[in-house]
Amino acid sequence: MYLFFVRHFNDIDHLTPIAWKMHRAGQPVAVYCMNPRYDHQSDYRLHFLKNLGITVDYLHNRFDRHRGLLHELLSRLVEKSCEAQRLSETMRTDVPFYKKRLSYLIGKFGILSYKLIRFGYYDIRWAHSILERSGARAICFDHIMPGLYVVRNLLQAAKEKSIPSFSLPHGVHLYTDEAAKAKSTDARRASKFNEFDHIIVPNRLRKDLLVRSGVSAKKIVVLGSARYSSEWLAQNKKIMPRRIPASANPPSRLKVVFMPSKPQYHADLSRLSTTCNLLAGMKNMDVMIKPHTRTGGEKHLFKDNNLPDASSVLTAELCEWADIALVVGSSVITEVLMQKKPALYLKYLHANTTLFEELGACWTIHDESELEHALRSLQKNKAAVPYGETRVVEYVKQVVYGGRAEKDVLGNYENFITAHAGK
């Protein structure tokens, strides 16, 4: 059995295509969510896998067993706190403060309860039992810190049983400056990756960075992006739930989606606000904004900006809907370019450099005045962009296909994992 361990929206986005491909190739696959706070039953990608007959469950539900009254009590507290947390996320803004505060405190208490269970019950013996009961041949994670959830115990148990571990991409690295994120240090990267047997990265840019950080080059293989492979994009289009009504497609208006990056990536928050106000005032345009899915506690930065919040709309649907996409450092530019739509890179909103910028595969915008001029120009002619198709082709080759000439990305993932799996 090939075990895939997931935790959040983004890693599920990148691991689902691989699990799907392996299942189609006849490999036994199971997907387990390590995060009790994530509602995996409402995730359309995991629902899709489950309908194919793939086992999808919470890890602690699948492999837990009764260990006494204290364990049962703590487990119940975790379950109830997760329910309260999900409820608080859907509360209206006019809900009394005390109710929001109560849900928040229950959620925090649930986290504490989970940590107590993890410390007292989810130990190395439990990890061994998971591998034995599942008949694991390989364990696959995203690029996760081993100290999170029960990852380190699973890695140790797998090593003791000679079962290989794989660290798979949960995104696409596109920053060409190493200081793109303050806490991303060489020491942190080395400690994060060196505990895994095999590390798969989407592009050479990411491999070179990890090697410079002290990660063994022998462990790293470049296989491209499963999430943006043509095979998965076509499949995802068939299964994704759509939220944008047909009436939101007036042909006379320019449809624009703005997808900023996480604020932690040296974002200029003042100019971000100015840009939102500029977009809100543009005539004959429909503009939606979708904050990054990992924005987390900084979501308040995007409130009251006079733009419709598209957080509940999938990125893939927004790329379909929009005539033009505005991006900063997000890999979503890849899907935009593969759909042959204009991609405007708002360089002035952060202090980083990017691969698509250096390859000339986008329209680089240096200030608010240039942005307004570019949008006015595209209103007249949506195809009038200052970058050529050859630049886009080279970008897609490096980012999606890992620099390879052949394009069977998912097949390469399946072949590599099965070739290095245990017996």
Give residue ranges: language-model regions:
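Active-site and donor-binding regions of nucleotide-sugar-utilizing enzymes
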Residues: 3-232, 333
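Acidic donor-binding loop of glycosyltransferase active sites
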Residues: 136-137, 317-328
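Catalytic binding pocket for nucleotide-activated donors in carbohydrate/polymer assembly enzymes
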Residues: 214-217, 222, 293, 301-306, ...
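Conserved catalytic-core segment of nucleotide-activated headgroup transferases in glycan assembly
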Residues: 227-301
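C-terminal alpha-helical cap of glycosyltransferases
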Residues: 399-423
